[in-house]
Each structure stands twice: as structure tokens, then as C-alpha cells.
């Protein structure tokens, strides 16, 4: 195309079309979307950069608040994690408080306070201390509801700023966790807890805690924190302006600023003491709050850190030596060591004098923690311990770590010292190896608890681990010490096949093996699912340590050991011990061995007679074992207990009589064991002491004036004699005892079935034992014999009560088995306790009359093992002649023996005039039995009665041995009211507090009754009845029969010449030289002088030395008092008075003249009418003045002689 041509329209259209397309794309939606995306991406990038910058700034800010314990610079991740933990803690606490506000404690338990009341409370507390302010913040919002005005001055902040801020914002970041932990709403006490009783039990008071609170107004002072002591309380605040709003739970805090203890006001030097606790790895566990003003550290600053890092580098090595000594003296009291230098918060060092102790884990036997008690010796250079630290400690982490490892490995060693822990009474390091053999408490789990329960230690294994119980004496001591919780169960068991072998087991092992009542506490412990506490472990450890440390000296005689201990080496030794034990038992008792066929199996007799059960507790059966202290010997008589639980329970089953009598042969009476020579040699010193005291009692006669005064009180004599005589008897007969016993009350309602007597050759029917049931006595739990099983101890000697032969009277039948006493078949044999054989029926009458002042036929157990008041008589080791004569076929005594007995009876009747002249009953050794060891087969039952109880024979037969007559019979009653005898006016009744005894049918009935009410006595030819603690019984009478009743109910004796005698636990029959009776009844039957002359005509007139002079030498033995001639005695007294006359003060001549002017009778040398009285002062009636003066004169003459 040529140059000059104009463009064509085709080209211009194409260009315009291209421009239209571009403009269309620019205004299209897609274009706008792309443009928007580009712009948004650019803004997001800018936002990210901005957020990143802000985040970096926040992280840098959080790093400033990071806890100062970290020495290294915190990273961004650490700061974010710390911030996250803080956020979670705040959220958890706020949610917890909201939950409690809805479902927590009732709102009524917390008092409501208004803002005005809070201001009043704040002013009251802050006015006393200028460094204290009160702040109240809400649990829901965390903002301060109220703050006292002093807070602005103390914190150096404006009050408006404080009122609008959160309380947590004022705290240092490192103390927030402590603040939240101590302000949990569930733990806070109520502000008015002194008025809310329930609050004391629902919410325990919280200990004060320490926090640092920031002061200043700008950020430049944000690191200036001061320590404060905070005490939180719970209150509810309501707003009166907005009553529709509910009350708001709030925390009221009393905030007190802490100052350095070395600045004014300074803490006294003697009170700068604090305590710390650290682990074997030297890490602080607990720090006393007293350490805050002394060290400058808050408790949370030290807890969890090493104690070595605060010590001077040169003193760190001392901690190794200190912990070595801690290991050496583990469990002992605290010990002191070298002083150490401790760094305070400001960087200065203080010198501490420390004492150290430790606590030992009783399970692992390792030291759990160490307790240090520190006293500040020197103060730091900078007294402000809270000042900012300028100096830096030379921390060598490597050295500290090495020392910690060394000390930790040192304290890993177990402690073997058997002493208690020095950390109070929480635990002990005693001998717990086998008791807590489960390694350590950290390994305990559910499975481990089951194993511990299955492997529960028994008392046998504990004794085996202790390994200190070597002989029977120690075993007996342990039994006696623990008899309150474990009743000792001992007894004698004879095997049917073995025949006579005694097996010994301790009551501990026996009761733990069976299901007796004493194993209930052990079973409860085994069933307990909870692990024992420190207190329980310490208690058990104390018991074990006491058993280990207690050493009992060896006893004099070799005795067998417990079969559960390791003292016996083989079975042969055990058998030998058993055989020796049985031999020594029989030898020491001097009694014939009962044949094996007659011995009761399993501790009881064969039940053939029926009747009421006679129950004896298993604890009572153990009284036979132990060391006899009745005599003055150390003989050990141990009776083995039953082997199995069944045997132990058999002792408590009803016992009945063995109807087959046990025949005794003369070959069985062998003299082994304690003979006369052995006793005399062994008790020579005791004899001499007794004789000396006996002579002193006779010569001094301290009872003469007392008895003289008592004799004048006619109506009151019957009440006082029982008590006073018993005291005299107790002092005379028991003053040589080695142990004092507390008198226990006797069961007042103890009773038993009736016993009767009948013809000597009657039939045996309807056996009724004379022992009450256990339920009738309130003291069944104590080891006592039934009251009916023996005569009380205050009668000079004891015999058990036995059922009597059957008797048949008109209209009524009485039956009792004529066998041996049922109680003695199963009782354990002890020294002085002799089992009676089954005596033939014809001799039971004679056998029953043996008691009262004569030595006992069967003395019971030793008083040291019998707590009952009626078991205090002294045991005898020799067999009584009355027992041996019971087997005699001859009934008539030789004439020579009869005459000799008459002379002895006369002396013994006279000897009752003084409570100390009865040598037989007063001697604790009973030496008169040593002269009669061999039985005399020629003696008759009547002769045996005279041998054993001459006093009773004298009362029955009179002075010349003939039958009693109306002139010579009387009723001797001690401890019971007067007894009436209206049918005969001349019958005498010597009564002392005994109830009336009626004898309307015959005037010559005589009765010796001690503590027994009247007793009915129908007629029967020949019988003798012993009734002790029984219901009203009716016994036939005989002209020569004696009815012995002790503590029995009223009885009447309508027969002819029956007599009754009884003994009481409160008194004994002692007839003094000047006192014999008093007013007998309300009607006043007889005077005391007439009774004295009729009943004992030769006693009252003769002085005591004359009685002793007439005593046969055979009976008196070593108790002879030197003769005293009356003229010589009076002459010596006059000489003594003449020699004393010169030493007496005398009036001078002038004094005599002066007195003569005032008193005319001095000048005339006469006696005035006021003092010229012929009657006795103690007499009540003027009519009896002459007789009383004569009686008093006789008494004075007797005393002077």
C-alpha cells in the first residue's frame, strides 16, 4: 500500500476490540476476586508480623516474671509452658470455687458482712499493728472487695489503684502457687469460728503462709517485693444496695509485713532458733516459719533445694561427718556437732549451732529424714536479710552433687539399733525385723497387703525373735504382767494311755492356738484391712523392747521350760523334765499319789452322781503354778495347762463327784520332799524373828487398854468384836507375809444347795455339790474359788466344804455322797494344797470337824497367788494327823494318849484368852505339824477330833472331858448377832455381832458360830454338819455333835444338846483375858462376869504368863517365854521408880508455900471429894462401880506382871 494512504477502517476496529476486551476483564468479577485475594494476603502477612511481634514482646515480658530459682536464661518454650501452667491454675481454682459456691457448704454456716462491717473489722485489727492491713477479695472475680487504708502506706501504692486491681496481681509470680494452695475455700476457717462450733470440726485452721507483694506505682519498682505473712479466713459479703444479688464468697486476709530479725524490733538472741528437715539426699523438706526473719528466705524458697548450696564451701564437708554421726546415733536423742555457716538471702553468712536427730522408717529400717535444730550464734554483716543479694555464692554444682551422692549412699544402710526414734512418738526403730518383713513401705501394694495379712506374725514367732525367755520364771512373770488381757490357763491333765505325764504350755501360745475368748483381739487385728499406723507400730515395738531388755534372775531350783521355747534340746529331755516335774510335785506336797485309775481325766471327775454343776474358771486353775511364797522357801511347783483348746474348755464344764472312793494304803505315805529337818533348817531365821516379835507383843500388851475399854461397852460389844478381833488376828498371823493383798468384797449373794448329815452307814443318794454357779457371783471373771469351797481365811486355818453323808429324818430326807471333796479332784496341785482321797463313809463325821484354831487338814493355795480375801491362810507342807487317822480301823484311843490330850485341851482352852498366845494358829510355819508326820492307826475318829480341834472338844465336853452340861455349855459366836436361849437362863452365849440363835427345846445347847445366822437343827443321834455360805439347812443333832457353819442363814436348834460352831471371813474366835462376852440379847440374859466364870472359870483370873508356864513343853516348843516371878518384877519396878525419882522435877519450898495458900488440900495432905472417886472412869453405871474397879485393878496387875 502506498505511503500516503490513510489507515483503513479495518485496523482501527481491531485495536478498539483489543482495548474493549482488556477493560472487560478489568471490570469482571474474577478480576475483582483476584485483586481482593492479593490485598487480603498482604494484610494477613502484616497481621502475622504484628502478632508475632506482640508475642515476642509478651514472651520477653513473661521471661521477666519467670521464677528466680532458675539460674539459666529461660527459653521461649519455658516461658510459654510456665504461662500455661499459671493459666490452668487460675482456671482450676476459679472453677473449683464456683462449684463450691453452688454445691459446697451451706451458706448459713458463714456469717454475712456488709462493706461497712468489713471496714470496722479492718480498723480493729490494723489499729494494733502499723505493719498489718486487711484485704478482702472475691472468690468469684478475684478482685479486691475491700482493703484497709493502711495498705496504701505499707505497699506505697494509691488506694484507688489497689481497690480496682486483683489481689493476685500484687503477688510475686513465684509465690502465686503457694497463695492458691493456701486460699482454697474448702480449707479456710470461718472468720467467726469461735461462734461456729461445727466449723471447728468441718474446717481446720490453716497455717499462715508467706508471699512477696509488689510495691510502687510504676514499672520501675516492679521487682521491689517485700515479704508478708498472710492469714486467710472465709466470709460472705452482701451488698445492701443490691439486695437481689446473692452474697458473694470472699477471702479475708490479714497481711503482716515481715522485718529482719536482726533489725529493730530485734528478735532476742535466746529466741533465734528454728528447725529444718531434710532428706538423706540433703534436700529441704520443711522449714520452720521462724526461719523467715532470720534467714531472709521464705519457706517455699528453701523447700526442694539442697541444703549444701546454702552452706559455706568450707563447711560442706562437715555434713558428711554429721550424717555419719546421724547414722550412728539413729533413733537416739539429738546430738550436737560443729557449728556451720549458712548463707542468708542478702548473701551474708551467719553461724549456726545445730543439733541433729533422725527418724527411722520402722518398715525399711532406714533413715527417712533428718531433723536439725539451729540456733543463730552470730548475726550477718548486713542486718537486713531481705535486701537484694549483691554477692554471689561460689556454687560448684559438681562438688555439691558429689557430696549429696556420698551422703545419700551412706544413709542407705539399715539401722540395727533397737531403740525408739528421736522424732516424738511417731514410730520406732525397735526390733521390727520379723514383724515388718515386707521390705519397705514403698513396695506395698494391694497384693502385698494380702501377703502381709496372710503372713501375720504370731506371738510365738515374736518370742522366738526376742530369744530372751529362757526359763520358767520369766514365763511366769510375763503371764502375770499380761493376765489382764490374756488370762493364764493352766491345769493338770492325765493322758489315758500315758498315765500321769504332765504337759506344759504357756497360756499365751495356748490361747493363740484355739478359738477361745482371749483370741478375739488378735482376730480383730488380723481382719483389719488397714495398715498399722505409726502409733501402733511404736506400741508394739515398746512392748517387744521391754521384753528384750528385762532380765529376770535365775531361780533357785531348776524347773522345766516351756515346750514352745527352745530350751529343751530333744524329746528325751522333755520327757525327763515331765517326769521330774511330777516327782517334785508329789514330793513337795508330801501326799500319797492318787492312783491313775482314780485320777479324773481332762481335769474333771467322772459324772456319776449328777447334781448341780461346780464351775471353776480356767483362770482360777492357773493359781496352782508359780513360786510358793506362803512358807519361806523358793520351791517351784508348776502345774501344766491343758494342751488343746478342748482341754482348756473342759475345765469350765460342770464338775461332779467321783463316787468311787480312792483307797489309801500305808505304803503310799512316804516322807519325801519337805520334812521337819528341811523346814527347820530353812526357816530358822524366820522362827527367831517370829519368836522375838511374839515376845514383844506379850510384854508390851498394847491391846490391854483397848480391850478393857471395849469390855465396858456392853451393848456395843457384839458389833465391835468381830472387826477388832479380825484385825488382831490378821496382824498376828500374817505379819510375816511377803506380799500385801487388797481385800476384795465377798459376794453377798453366794449360796448353794443344802447339805445334810445322816447315819454313818446310810445310803448315798441325791448328791448335791456345795458350790454355787458362776452366775451367782459378781466376780466370776476373777480367778477365785467359790465361797462355799473353803472356810474363810480369818478362821485361823482353812478346809474346803465337803458334802456330808446321807441322812434320813422324820418327814424329810437329806442325802449327800460320802466321797472326797469334788473340787479337789480337778484342782491343780500347789505347795500346801493336798488332794483328799475319797474317805470311807463312816469317817466323814470325824473328818468334817477338823477346823478352827488347829492347823488345817487341807490348807489351800498360797496367799501370794490368791487375790480373794478368804484365801490368806498359810499353807502346810506336812500331812495332818487327822487325815491319817481317818483311815484307822480302831475307834478308841489309848488311855495315855487320852490323858495327854486332856492336858493339851486345858492349855489350849486357856490360851484363847489372848490373841497372840495361840502358837499353833499364829505361827506361819505350823511347826507343830513337824512332830506328827507318821499316821497313827490306833487313833479313833473321836481321838482325831480331839487332836485336830481341842478347843471345840473343850467347848463340847468341858474341862474334864465329860459331856456338856447346862452349867458349862454356851454359845460362842463371833461376827454374828446375839443368839437367844430363852429356855435356860444359865446357858452362856459368847457372841460378837452374830444373829440370834434360838434353842427353845433344851437349855444346854452350845454353838460356836462365826459370821453365821441361826441354823435349824432337828434331832438326830449322831451327826456333824459343816455349812459354809449355804441356804437355811436343817441338820440332825447329837449330844456330842458340832454344827460348823460359816456365813450360813438363820438356824434354829430345837434338839437337846446340839452344838454349832462356825468360822467367818471377818473375824476369828479369840477369847481375850479380860473380854469374853457382853450383852447377849435385847433382854439382857447374863452379865459378863457370870459368863466368864461359868464357861472359862480359870482363864480370866490368871495372867498370861501363868498360862504359858502351865503349857506343856511339847506344844509350846520354841515359843516359851521366860518365867517372871511377881515379887522380883515388883521389886525391880520399885527400884526403877526410885532411881527415876531423883530426875523428876520438884517444887521448891517457896513454890510449895505458894500453892498451899491457893489449895488447902495440899497443906492438909488430903484428897478432895472431886477426885476421891472409887468407881472406874470407863464404867457407865454407878451400881457396877465397885465391880468395875476390881476388874480394872485385876487388869492392871496382870499388865504389870
From Swiss-Prot:
An example Gene Ontology CC term for this record: cytoplasm
InterPro entries, A to Z: PAS (IPR000014), PAS-like_dom_sf (IPR035965), PAS_fold_3 (IPR013655), Per1-3_PAS-A (IPR048814), Period_circadian-like_C (IPR022728), Period_circadian_regulator (IPR050760)
Mod. after translation: Phosphorylation by CSNK1E is weak and appears to require association with PER1 and translocation to the nucleus. Ubiquitinated.
Record SUPFAM superfamilies: PYP-like sensor domain (PAS domain)
A GO term, aspect molecular function: kinase binding
Impact when changing residue 1028 to T: Only found in PER3.4 allele
Phosphoserine PTM positions: 919, 994, 1053
Sequence motif Nuclear localization signal, residues: 729-745
Protein's name according to its UniProt entry: Period circadian protein homolog 3
Subunit structure and binding partners: Homodimer. Component of the circadian core oscillator, which includes the CRY proteins, CLOCK or NPAS2, BMAL1 or BMAL2, CSNK1D and/or CSNK1E, TIMELESS and the PER proteins. Interacts directly with PER1, PER2, CRY1, CRY2, and TIMELESS; interaction with CRY1 and CRY2 is weak and not rhythmic. Interacts with FBXW11 and BTRC.
CDD domains: PAS
Compartment(s) where it occurs, according to its Swiss-Prot or TrEMBL record: Cytoplasm; Nucleus
Record's compositionally biased regions (Basic residues): 733-743
Segments of skewed composition (Polar residues): 721-731, 957-976, 983-994, 1001-1012, 1035-1050
Annotated motif Nuclear export signal 1, positions: 55-64
Primary subcellular site in the record, as a coarse category: cytoplasm
Species for this entry: Homo sapiens
Amino acid at each position: 500500500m502506498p505511503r500516503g494512504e490513510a489507515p483503513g477502517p479495518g485496523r482501527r476496529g481491531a485495536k478498539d476490540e483489543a482495548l474493549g476486551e482488556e477493560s472487560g476483564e478489568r471490570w469482571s468479577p474474577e478480576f475483582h476476586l483476584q485483586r481482593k485475594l492479593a490485598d487480603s494476603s498482604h494484610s494477613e502477612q502484616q497481621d502475622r508480623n504484628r502478632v508475632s511481634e506482640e508475642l515476642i514482646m509478651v514472651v520477653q515480658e513473661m521471661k521477666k516474671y519467670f521464677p528466680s530459682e532458675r539460674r539459666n536464661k529461660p527459653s521461649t518454650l519455658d516461658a510459654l509452658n510456665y504461662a500455661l501452667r499459671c493459666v490452668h491454675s487460675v482456671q482450676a481454682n476459679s472453677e473449683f470455687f464456683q462449684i463450691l459456691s453452688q454445691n459446697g457448704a451451706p451458706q448459713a454456716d458463714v456469717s454475712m458482712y456488709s462493706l461497712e462491717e468489713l471496714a470496722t473489722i479492718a480498723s480493729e485489727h490494723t489499729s494494733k499493728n502499723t505493719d498489718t492491713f486487711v484485704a478482702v477479695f472475691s472468690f468469684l472475680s478475684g478482685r479486691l472487695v475491700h482493703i484497709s487504708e493502711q495498705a496504701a502506706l505499707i505497699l506505697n501504692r494509691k488506694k484507688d489503684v489497689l481497690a480496682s486491681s486483683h489481689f493476685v496481681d500484687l503477688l510475686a509470680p513465684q509465690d502465686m502457687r503457694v497463695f492458691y494452695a493456701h486460699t482454697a475455700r474448702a480449707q479456710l476457717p470461718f472468720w467467726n469460728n469461735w461462734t461456729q462450733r461445727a466449723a471447728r470440726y468441718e474446717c481446720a485452721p490453716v497455717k499462715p503462709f508467706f508471699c512477696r507483694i509488689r510495691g510502687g506505682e510504676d514499672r520501675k519498682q516492679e521487682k521491689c517485693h517485700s515479704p508478708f505473712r498472710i492469714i486467710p479466713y472465709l466470709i460472705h459479703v452482701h451488698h445492701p444496695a443490691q439486695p437481689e444479688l446473692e452474697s458473694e464468697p470472699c477471702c479475708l486476709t490479714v497481711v503482716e509485713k515481715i522485718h529482719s530479725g536482726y533489725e529493730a524490733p530485734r528478735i532476742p538472741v535466746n529466741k533465734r532458733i528454728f528447725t529444718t528437715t531434710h532428706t538423706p539426699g540433703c534436700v529441704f523438706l520443711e522449714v520452720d516459719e521462724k526461719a523467715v526473719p532470720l534467714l531472709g528466705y521464705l519457706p517455699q524458697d528453701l523447700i526442694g533445694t539442697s541444703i549444701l548450696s546454702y552452706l559455706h564451701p568450707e563447711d560442706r564437708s562437715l555434713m558428711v561427718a554429721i550424717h555419719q554421726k546421724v547414722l550412728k546415733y539413729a533413733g537416739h536423742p539429738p546430738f550436737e556437732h560443729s557449728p556451720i555457716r549458712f548463707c542468708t538471702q542478702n548473701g551474708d553468712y551467719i553461724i549456726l549451732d545445730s543439733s541433729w536427730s533422725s527418724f527411722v522408717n520402722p518398715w525399711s529400717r532406714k533413715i527417712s529424714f533428718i531433723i536439725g535444730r539451729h540456733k543463730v550464734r552470730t548475726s550477718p554483716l548486713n542486718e537486713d536479710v531481705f535486701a537484694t543479694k549483691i554477692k554471689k555464692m561460689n556454687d560448684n554444682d559438681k562438688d555439691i552433687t558429689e557430696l549429696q551422692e556420698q551422703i545419700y549412699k551412706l544413709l542407705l544402710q539399715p539401722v540395727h539399733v533397737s531403740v525408739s526414734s528421736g522424732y516424738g512418738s511417731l514410730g520406732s526403730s525397735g526390733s521390727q525385723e520379723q514383724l515388718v518383713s515386707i521390705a519397705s513401705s514403698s513396695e506395698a501394694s494391694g497384693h502385698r497387703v494380702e501377703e502381709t495379712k496372710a503372713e501375720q506374725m504370731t506371738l510365738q514367732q515374736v518370742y522366738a525373735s526376742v530369744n530372751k525367755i529362757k526359763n520358767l520364771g520369766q514365763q511366769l512373770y510375763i503371764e502375770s504382767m499380761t493376765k489382764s488381757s490374756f488370762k493364764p490357763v493352766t491345769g493338770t491333765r492325765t493322758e489315758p494311755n500315758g498315765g500321769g505325764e504332765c504337759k506344759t504350755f504357756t497360756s499365751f501360745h495356748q490361747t493363740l492356738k484355739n478359738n477361745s475368748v482371749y483370741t478375739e483381739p488378735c482376730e480383730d487385728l488380723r481382719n483389719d484391712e488397714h495398715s498399722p499406723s505409726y502409733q501402733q507400730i511404736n506400741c508394739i515395738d515398746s512392748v517387744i523392747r521391754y521384753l528384750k531388755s528385762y532380765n529376770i534372775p535365775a531361780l533357785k531350783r531348776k524347773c522345766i521350760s516351756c515346750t514352745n521355747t527352745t530350751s529343751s534340746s530333744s524329746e528325751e529331755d522333755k520327757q525327763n523334765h515331765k517326769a521330774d516335774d511330777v516327782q517334785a510335785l508329789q514330793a513337795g506336797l508330801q501326799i500319797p499319789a492318787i492312783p491313775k485309775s482314780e485320777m479324773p481325766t481332762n481335769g474333771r471327775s467322772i459324772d456319776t452322781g449328777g447334781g448341780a454343776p461346780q464351775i471353776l474358771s480356767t483362770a482360777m486353775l492357773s493359781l496352782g503354778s508359780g513360786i510358793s511364797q506362803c512358807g519361806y522357801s523358793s520351791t517351784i511347783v508348776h502345774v501344766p495347762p491343758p494342751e488343746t483348746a478342748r482341754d482348756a474348755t473342759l475345765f469350765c464344764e460342770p464338775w461332779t463327784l467321783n463316787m468311787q472312793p480312792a483307797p489309801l494304803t500305808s505304803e503310799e505315805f512316804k516322807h519325801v520332799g519337805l520334812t521337819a529337818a528341811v523346814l527347820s533348817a530353812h526357816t530358822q531365821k524366820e522362827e527367831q524373828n517370829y519368836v522375838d516379835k511374839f515376845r514383844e507383843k506379850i510384854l508390851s500388851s498394847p491391846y490391854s487398854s483397848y480391850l478393857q475399854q471395849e469390855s465396858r461397852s456392853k451393848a456395843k460389844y457384839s458389833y465391835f468384836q468381830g472387826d477388832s478381833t479380825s484385825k488382831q488376828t490378821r496382824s498376828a498371823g500374817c505379819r510375816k507375809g511377803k506380799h500385801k493383798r487388797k481385800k476384795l468384797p465377798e459376794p453377798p449373794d453366794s449360796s448353794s444347795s443344802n447339805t445334810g448329815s445322816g447315819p454313818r452307814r446310810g445310803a448315798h443318794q441325791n448328791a448335791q455339790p456345795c458350790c454355787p454357779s458362776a452366775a451367782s457371783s459378781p466376780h466370776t471373771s476373777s480367778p477365785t474359788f467359790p465361797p462355799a469351797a473353803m472356810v474363810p481365811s480369818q478362821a485361823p486355818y482353812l478346809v474346803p466344804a465337803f458334802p456330808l453323808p446321807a441322812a434320813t429324818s422324820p418327814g424329810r430326807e437329806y442325802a449327800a455322797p460320802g466321797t472326797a471333796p469334788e473340787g479337789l479332784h480337778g484342782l491343780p496341785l500347789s505347795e500346801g494344797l493336798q488332794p483328799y482321797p475319797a474317805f470311807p463313809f463312816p469317817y466323814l463325821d470325824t473328818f468334817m470337824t477338823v477346823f478352827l484354831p488347829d492347823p488345817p487338814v487341807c490348807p489351800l493355795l498360797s496367799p501370794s497367788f490368791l487375790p480373794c480375801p478368804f484365801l490368806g491362810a498359810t499353807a502346810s507342807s506336812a500331812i495332818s494327823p487327822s487325815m491319817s487317822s481317818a483311815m484307822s480301823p480302831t475307834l478308841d484311843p489309848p488311855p495315855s494318849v487320852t490323858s495327854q490330850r486332856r492336858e493339851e485341851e486345858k492349855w489350849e482352852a486357856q490360851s484363847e484368852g489372848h490373841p497372840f498366845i495361840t502358837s499353833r494358829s499364829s505361827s506361819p510355819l505350823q511347826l507343830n505339824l513337824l512332830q506328827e508326820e507318821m499316821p497313827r492307826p490306833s487313833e479313833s475318829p473321836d481321838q482325831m477330833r480331839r487332836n485336830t480341834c481341842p478347843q471345840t472338844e473343850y467347848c463340847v465336853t468341858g474341862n474334864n472331858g465329860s459331856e456338856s452340861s447346862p452349867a458349862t455349855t454356851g454359845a460362842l459366836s463371833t461376827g454374828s448377832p446375839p443368839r437367844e436361849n430363852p429356855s435356860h437362863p444359865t446357858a452362856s452365849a459368847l457372841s460378837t455381832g452374830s444373829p440370834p440363835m434360838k434353842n427353845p427345846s433344851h437349855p444346854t445347847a452350845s454353838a460356836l458360830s462365826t459370821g453365821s445366822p441361826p441354823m435349824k437343827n432337828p434331832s438326830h443321834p449322831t451327826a456333824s454338819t459343816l455349812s459354809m455360805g449355804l441356804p437355811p439347812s436343817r441338820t440332825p443333832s447329837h449330844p456330842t455333835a458340832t454344827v460348823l457353819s460359816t456365813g450360813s442363814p438363820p438356824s434354829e436348834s430345837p434338839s437337846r444338846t446340839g452344838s454349832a460352831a462356825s468360822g467367818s471371813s471377818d473375824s476369828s474366835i479369840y477369847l481375850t483375858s479380860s473380854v469374853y462376852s457382853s450383852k447377849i440379847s435385847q433382854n439382857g440374859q447374863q452379865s459378863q462376869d457370870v459368863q466368864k466364870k461359868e464357861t472359862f472359870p480359870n482363864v480370866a483370873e490368871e495372867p498370861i504368863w501363868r498360862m504359858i508356864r502351865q503349857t506343856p513343853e511339847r506344844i509350846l516348843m520354841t515359843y516359851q517365854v521366860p518365867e517372871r516371878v511377881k515379887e522380883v518384877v515388883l521389886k525391880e519396878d520399885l527400884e526403877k521408880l526410885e532411881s527415876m525419882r531423883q530426875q523428876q522435877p520438884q517444887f521448891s519450898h517457896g513454890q510449895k508455900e505458894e500453892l498451899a495458900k491457893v489449895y488447902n488440900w495440899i497443906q492438909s495432905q488430903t484428897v478432895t471429894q472431886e477426885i476421891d472417886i472409887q468407881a472406874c472412869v470407863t464404867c457407865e453405871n454407878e451400881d457396877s462401880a465397885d465391880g468395875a474397879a476390881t476388874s480394872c485393878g485385876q487388869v492392871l496387875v496382870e499388865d504389870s506382871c
